[in-house]
Amino acid sequence: MPTRLAALGAAVLFAVAGCSSPADESATIVTPPSPAEDLAELPAASAGGACILWDYDFIEQNLGVRFAVAAADQVDDTSTCVVQTLSAPWPDLALSVVETTKANATIFLDTRMPEKATKLTGLGKAGYRMNTKASGEHGPTVEIGWLSEAKQLQTLRFTFAKDATAADVKDMNAKLLELAKALSTTNG
């Protein structure tokens, strides 16, 4: 009896491992991947980098968009974080933080503010907002950059999906500014 069970176990193992004859296709076992909804959502902060500064609930409360995956990096004194949904490459939201700078408000606006940006008030020592049109496969972007009270350079950039409307962009201008203000504390 144990010999028969061992032989049966070996036959099943060889069949699953692809050692069956080509004519025996029914012996192949295929396990479909789990749907994305079944995956456990890791906190954004678990990605490290600038992701430690926020979580998905905080972002959703400010922007009305639910993100579920985060990636981060740190090079020298610059930390970054990008969050996305599971369903598509856009929208996405990126945050970059340069830990410290010698720039003052004038230097920031003269050298860090993009040419087509609009100066913002009420955000750190100096700030700007820039909207760009859709490009490539993604939609328009809203970018807010500022020099924080703690002398950090911070940038938020929301990239829309291709189908975003002008009203979506206008609405995101206000929401992204509120998120920037929530991130811009006296300590950072």
Predicted regions located by residue number:
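Bacterial N-terminal signal peptides that target proteins for export
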Residues: 1-8
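C-terminal motif of bacterial Sec signal peptides marking the signal peptidase cleavage site
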Residues: 15-18
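A small/polar (G/S/T-enriched), proline-flanked helix-loop surface module common
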Residues: 22-188
